[in-house]
Amino acid sequence: MSNRALSVVVLAAGKGSRMFSTLPKVLHPLAGKAMVQHVIDTAMRLGASRIHLVYGHGGELLRERLARQYAPLNWVLQAEQRGTGHAVQQTLTCLRDEEDVLILYGDVPLISPDTLQCLLAARPQGGIGLLTVTLDNPEGYGRIVRLNGEVAGIVEQKDASEQQRQIKEINTGILVAGGEDIKRWLGQLTNKNAQGEFYLTDIIAMAWHEGRKINAVQPTRQTEVEGVNNRLQLARLERLFQREQAERLLLAGVMLSDPDRFDLRGEFRHGQDVSIDTNVILEGQVTLGDRVIIGTGCVLKNVVIGDDVIISPYTVIEDARVAARSTLGPFARLRPGSELEEDAHVGNFVEMKQARLGKGSKAGHLSYLGDAEIGAQVNIGAGTITCNYDGANKHKTHIGDDVFVGSDSQLVAPVTIGRGATIGAGTTVTRDVAEGEMIISRIRQFPLANWTRPVKKK
């Protein structure tokens, strides 16, 4: 394996017309992340010193989505799409003689660092490392031509003879070569072929005619080199990828009720004896402690969940923290900035945002708690609302320990309710409540004399 610096070229200029979308093909998501982001992340994990992104169709949108997250990218425009060789030619002024150059594709998202490390290690001095795969049905792919067992060239499907079309080893397009060599070969490319395009694959024959060795390497899994040209292929690749992730988690001790009905769209850390029911989606950065139970249909995004937490079905949690032994749902929602301390409970149809629920506190039913600091051992009655927005600004509600808030109460912020206070059902709180105080603001109940119920007109 070479000790030289590694430069990675990512080809991402294709329009993707078969996606039938205004979104550039490489920006379509797989497992919650744009396909091209998977490729860039892999290149970064390889320790690439420079990454050149060749873009074309939808370039402004591509730069808008990626430039901030991937500041070191070198953006290279391919104004006219004339083949893979032409795409890499656009980087000629960027490539250095003393580095190795690895070619990747923005629509081949699942290529792994392990496979690429093997490819880099296999590149012979002065030659090419080429990633190939053997398919039962190689229709549509460029075939690997061998002479005396050695790779001698690649012939594209449309240029292949009937005999060559019987070859089952195909080109993935992924290769690595020295900068000085690949620059020379790129300068020799022509478009004298059935497509009238500049094929990157032609450099294989050039290397062979120079007496250079081409070492072929195959990926660990075939899914690593599957490309995406339409939504059907993307959906199939998504399910294959999710199945692989589910199997990995099962082998690591996570209980998945059905591995075919689980989606992981980010990074997942977990403790022991975690149990996840069907149709659960984990997004972003998710951390689950020991013995966490997640019911069917839940969505967790960028969350930290403590030990022994039970999350009942159809609960949605985003950018929040839940401490040990808390319970949520069913149908609860924690929006960004929410936090539950130990042994807290958020029940059905309770929504929290920028709010903290203290140790042992409970909000069991049908409540909205926004911009609120709630102490320990507080009971929030059904239908309670913290009225945090005055039409222009948000305001805080502070609730001390051991407070009891009766059902159907409105707490108009900014307001503070002291420790041990009791709020009667149906009360609208507009002023601070002292410690231990009992308040009630609903009108006195009285009967209406001589009242009769209306009767429907016939």
Swiss-Prot record:
PROSITE patterns: HEXAPEP_TRANSFERASES. Residues 253-458 are annotated as: N-acetyltransferase. Residues 232-252 are annotated as: Linker. Keywords: Acyltransferase, Cell shape, Cell wall biogenesis/degradation, Cytoplasm, Magnesium, Metal-binding, Multifunctional enzyme, Nucleotidyltransferase, Peptidoglycan synthesis, Repeat, Transferase. One of its GO terms (biological process) is cell wall organization. It holds the Pfam family Hexapep. Binds 1 Mg(2+) ion per subunit. The keyword Kinase does not apply. Pathway: Nucleotide-sugar biosynthesis; UDP-N-acetyl-alpha-D-glucosamine biosynthesis; N-acetyl-alpha-D-glucosamine 1-phosphate from alpha-D-glucosamine 6-phosphate (route II): step 2/2; Nucleotide-sugar biosynthesis; UDP-N-acetyl-alpha-D-glucosamine biosynthesis; UDP-N-acetyl-alpha-D-glucosamine from N-acetyl-alpha-D-glucosamine 1-phosphate: step 1/1; Bacterial outer membrane biogenesis; LPS lipid A biosynthesis. PANTHER family: BIFUNCTIONAL PROTEIN GLMU, NUCLEOTIDYL TRANSFERASE. Catalyzes the last two sequential reactions in the de novo biosynthetic pathway for UDP-N-acetylglucosamine (UDP-GlcNAc). The C-terminal domain catalyzes the transfer of acetyl group from acetyl coenzyme A to glucosamine-1-phosphate (GlcN-1-P) to produce N-acetylglucosamine-1-phosphate (GlcNAc-1-P), which is converted into UDP-GlcNAc by the transfer of uridine 5-monophosphate (from uridine 5-triphosphate), a reaction catalyzed by the N-terminal domain. One of its GO terms (cellular component) is cytoplasm. The gene is glmU. Acetyl-CoA binds at residues 382, 388-389, 407, 425, 442. Residues 1-231 are annotated as: Pyrophosphorylase. This is Bifunctional protein GlmU. It catalyses: alpha-D-glucosamine 1-phosphate + acetyl-CoA = N-acetyl-alpha-D-glucosamine 1-phosphate + CoA + H(+); N-acetyl-alpha-D-glucosamine 1-phosphate + UTP + H(+) = UDP-N-acetyl-alpha-D-glucosamine + diphosphate. Its main location: cytoplasm. GO terms for molecular function: glucosamine-1-phosphate N-acetyltransferase activity; magnesium ion binding; UDP-N-acetylglucosamine diphosphorylase activity. In the N-terminal section; belongs to the N-acetylglucosamine-1-phosphate uridyltransferase family.
